[in-house]
């Protein structure tokens, strides 16, 4: 499944990992549909791809709205003819706790990070199953392995997304359609980084208290995108079910001889 030209849909493509993933696939010759709420940002990236000789279009996608998800799926298929690769990168994170967060706010995060992804997969996957070929790549987070306080809805929904992916892997076995998880560690994107200092500072202090900050290294969005591409371009007969990507610790200077 490594041949160039497989039509690819990327959600959350307005910035960060999603944008980097769209650019990485486009550089290999794949036609792309980019989706996100900030569709104008997606269109800027689509124009960049087209200027480089690629094929790309942007479509508005709001994972909070059922009608938007359905319209996006229909538009993506219309633009590409078919979808061979669906990459679910869309996500949102707010500094929320279990106790004290209004249920409707908690539910909104779960809708974006989990339920919206399930809806889109349910619309795209049947065509893949019928053709006996396709890749569904779900980008989760290392919070599944190392939950963080003050991110309760994000942790819950990413755990759910991995559970969905695992169930999907069993459902799809023998169909020629692969469902895969890419689980990145801390990544230098806008998500969470734009929190005000008075919010981010106490959050980081809490993570340190729980031993969740080992070093100051961060992944680039491009590094995670390469992992996504690697997963989706494996040859038939090979299935990377879970790929974890973590930042390497900054290299320390050698110790002076005592």
Please report, for each region that a protein language model flagged, where it lies by residue:
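Conserved glycine-rich cofactor-binding loop
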Residues: 14-15
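Conserved glycine-rich Rossmann-like NAD(P)H-binding loop of the short-chain dehydrogenase/reductase
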Residues: 30-44
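The beta1-alpha1 cofactor-binding region of Rossmann-like NAD(H)/NADP(H)-dependent oxidoreductases
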Residues: 39, 60-71, 103
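Substrate-binding pocket helix/loop in short-chain dehydrogenase/reductase
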Residues: 97-98, 102-110
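Active-site helix of classical SDR
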Residues: 121, 157
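Residue(s) in the substrate-gating loop at a strand-loop-helix junction
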Residues: 141
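C-terminal helical subdomain
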Residues: 181, 201-254
């Amino acid at each position: 499944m490594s041949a160039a030209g497989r039509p690819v849909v990327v959600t959350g493509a307005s910035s960060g990992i999603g944008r980097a993933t769209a650019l990485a696939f486009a550089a290999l010759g794949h036609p792309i549909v980019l989706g996100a709420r900030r569709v104008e940002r997606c269109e800027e990236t689509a124009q960049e791809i087209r200027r480089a000789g690629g094929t790309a279009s942007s479509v508005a996608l709001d994972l909070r709205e059922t009608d938007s998800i359905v319209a996006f799926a229909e538009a993506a298929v219309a633009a590409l003819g078919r979808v061979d690769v669906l990459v679910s990168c869309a996500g949102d994170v707010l500094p929320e706790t279990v106790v004290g967060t209004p249920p409707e706010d908690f539910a909104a995060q779960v809708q974006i990070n989990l339920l919206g992804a399930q809806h889109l997969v349910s619309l795209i996957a049947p065509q893949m199953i019928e053709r006996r070929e396709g890749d569904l790549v779900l980008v989760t987070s290392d919070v599944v392995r190392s939950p963080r306080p003050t991110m309760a809805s994000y942790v819950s929904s990413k755990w759910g997304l991995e559970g969905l992916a695992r169930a999907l892997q069993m459902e799809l076995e023998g169909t020629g359609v692969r469902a895969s998880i890419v689980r990145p560690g801390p990544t230098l994107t806008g998500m969470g980084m734009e929190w005000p200092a008075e919010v981010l500072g106490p959050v980081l202090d809490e993570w340190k208290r729980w031993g969740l900050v080992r070093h100051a290294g961060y992944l680039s969005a491009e590094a995670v995108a390469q992992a996504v591409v690697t997963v989706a371009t494996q040859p038939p007969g090979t299935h990377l079910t879970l790929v974890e990507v973590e930042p390497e610790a900054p290299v320390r200077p050698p110790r002076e001889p005592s």
